[in-house]
């Protein structure tokens, strides 16, 4: 019985994507979500970069309408296998977006007009020779940095795509060996004008984000192995960062010149290296970056390791959470919902919501049955976004968040109380009685009337919680900017 109960703890999510972007002709290598706007930027194996703006309310409305149609339509009228969310193929030659689903295309032809799908292309460009290797926004999202297999770093305006600065990174190094290094990761400081770029030889270079000049290099951090991930440790200092490579985690200060790892024979080294994990460390993030007391790392053998910097200064993991045996955890991002959770992207095509406090998976969503999940991110309203070589999915906000917001604002003056399930059952049965028998056009009109009211209430509810989190984030950022240089050291 105990074993059966354990299985039911993992919930297969009922949440669906509001948008799916597909690339049927070129592999997707990287995708970024703007921190403050509904903008997604995608880099491809062909060197192209495309920027799209989407309307979350319109996309959610379309999804809800399809759900209600599926509920109200019975018998022969039911459409099996019809995808309820918008699916668009990206044409890299023209930048156009084309509906993938035949049912949606047929509906547009019948109406005789192109429906506003809630997504538009802002710009597209052939940015790099070869593939796009890494991308990142600056702290405000005004500019985007990208590096390709051509070893050229470019800084461009986010809204227009126009390049404002570029540099051939090979020209910054004297050694012929270093000139041929390929780059794997980009990470921008949120408080200072510099970015970090990691390469396949385990080096991290500090680049001035204004003029793209080389400021410093931290070499051979992971004993010559590739940099898998880089992220900020600003709880300790604005200049402290963590990198992951091969089977170790490293912690360093970007200002240190000629820093060496603190290994046997060099115990005074300024780069703190963890114990050998005997498994590749692929990705990592803090559960709550503002508190930074718990760090989770995705591993090559399907587990997530838990690290506590305040306990042992990141010398070794404290515990582990099993996710999926014989698979790899390739990407990870915090939910930023004050729920002690992170999202993990797995090589089996699933994304897992992992509760670090409980030490277990609490939710599973399927991104792709055939392709691995190579990146996860959050959009400006904290929707999770998953991506692989073939497609990108922007998922709807969790129903838990919507219910939580609704419960806070609800009145307790009702003479009789009903459960949410009872109310939803009553509503759905009413809809079925009213809508069955109508033509498809009449059915859509009736549903649109209801959805307009529902989405206005939902939008107001969601905006309040999002605005609150953004205000807290902005206040913390302002605090960081005005604090003294030795701020937040745990020992002081």
From Swiss-Prot:
GO terms for cellular component: nucleolus. The keyword Hydrolase does not apply. This is WD repeat-containing protein JIP5. Keywords: Nucleus, Repeat, WD repeat. Residues 449-462 have a biased composition (Basic and acidic residues). Residues 404-414, 422-433 have a biased composition (Acidic residues). It is found in: Nucleus, Nucleolus. InterPro entries: WD40/YVTN_repeat-like_dom_sf, WD40_repeat_dom_sf, WD_repeat_multifunction. Interacts with BRE1, BUD27 and GIS1.
């Amino acid at each position: 019985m105990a074993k059966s109960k354990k299985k039911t703890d993992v919930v297969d999510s009922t949440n669906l994507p509001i948008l799916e972007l597909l690339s049927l002709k070129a592999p997707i290598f990287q995708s970024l979500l703007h921190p403050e706007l509904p903008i997604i930027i995608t880099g491809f194996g062909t060197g192209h970069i495309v920027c799209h703006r989407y309307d979350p309310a319109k996309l959610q409305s379309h999804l809800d309408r399809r759900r209600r149609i599926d509920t109200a339509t019975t018998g022969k009228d039911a459409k099996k296998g019809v995808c309820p969310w918008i699916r668009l193929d990206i044409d890299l030659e023209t930048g156009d977006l084309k509906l993938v689903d035949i049912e949606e295309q047929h509906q547009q032809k019948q109406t005789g007009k192109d429906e506003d799908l809630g997504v538009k292309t802002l710009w597209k460009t052939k940015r790099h020779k070869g593939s796009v290797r890494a991308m990142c926004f600056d702290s405000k999202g005004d500019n985007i940095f990208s590096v390709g297999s051509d070893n050229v770093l470019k800084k461009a305006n986010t809204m227009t795509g126009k390049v404002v600065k570029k540099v051939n990174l090979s020209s910054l190094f004297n050694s012929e060996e270093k000139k041929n290094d390929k780059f794997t990761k980009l990470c921008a400081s949120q408080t200072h004008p510099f970015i970090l770029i990691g390469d396949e030889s385990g080096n991290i270079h500090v680049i001035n984000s204004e003029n793209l000049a080389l400021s410093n290099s931290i070499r051979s951090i992971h004993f010559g192995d590739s940099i898998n991930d880089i992220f900020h440790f600003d709880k300790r200092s604005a200049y402290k960062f963590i990198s992951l490579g091969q089977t170790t985690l490293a912690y360093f200060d970007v200002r240190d010149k000629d820093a060496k790892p603190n290994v046997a024979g060099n115990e005074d080294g300024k780069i703190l290296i963890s114990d050998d994990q005997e498994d590749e460390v692929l990705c990592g993030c803090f559960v709550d970056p503002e508190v930074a007391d718990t760090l989770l790392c995705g591993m090559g053998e399907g587990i997530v390791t838990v690290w506590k910097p305040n306990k042992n200064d990141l010398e070794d993991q404290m515990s582990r959470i099993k996710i999926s045996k014989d698979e790899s955890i390739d990407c990870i991002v915090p939910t930023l919902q004050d729920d002690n959770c992170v999202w993990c992207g797995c090589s089996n095509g699933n994304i897992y919501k992992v509760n670090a406090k409980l030490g277990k998976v609490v939710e599973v969503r399927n991104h792709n049955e055939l392709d691995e999940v190579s990146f996860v991110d959050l959009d400006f309203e904290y929707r999770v976004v998953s991506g692989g070589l073939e497609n990108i999915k922007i998922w709807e906000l969790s129903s838990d968040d919507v219910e939580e917001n609704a419960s806070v604002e609800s009145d307790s003056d009702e003479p009789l109380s009903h459960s949410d399930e009872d109310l939803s059952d009553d509503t759905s049965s009413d809809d079925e009685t009213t809508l069955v028998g109508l033509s498809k056009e009449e059915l859509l009109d009736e549903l649109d009337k209801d959805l307009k009211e529902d989405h206005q209430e939902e939008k107001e509810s969601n905006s309040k919680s999002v605005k609150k989190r953004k205000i807290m984030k902005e206040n913390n950022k302002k605090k960081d900017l005005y604090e003294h240089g030795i701020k937040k050291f745990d020992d002081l």
